[in-house]
C-alpha cells in the first residue's frame, strides 16, 4: 500500500521520517518529496534501521521488495558504520542533502517471531538542504 504525500504549497522548518524508508516502495522518491517540503534552512530528521533490509508491507501481513532499489553500497553494507556511511554518500548527498549529524540509537521492534520484541540499531540522520539533486527522477 502506498500513499502519496499531498501537495500543500507549504514548506516546513522541520520534517521527520522515522523508520519509514525501509518500509516504502519508493524510498528515493519519498526523500525527494520530503526535500521539497523543507524551507531553505529546514531540517529533515531521518531514522532508519541499519543494515538496510527493506520489506514493504502489503495486505494480509505479506511483504515485498521495494520497486525502487537503493545503490549497491547501501544494500551490501554489513555493519552500522558501513550502512550509515553508504546512506550518507550514496543516497542523501546525491539527493541534495547535507548530512549534519549521524547518531546510533536503539530501536525496539515487534518484528520478531510471534510478535516478540527485537532490539535493532537505528541510524538517526540530521539533514539540511545542500546542493541540487544529482539523482535522476
Task: Locate predicted features.
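Short conserved loop adjoining the S-adenosyl-L-methionine
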Residues: 3-10
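A short His-aromatic
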Residues: 19-23
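Short alpha-helix
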Residues: 75-104
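Conserved class I S-adenosyl-L-methionine
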Residues: 43-72
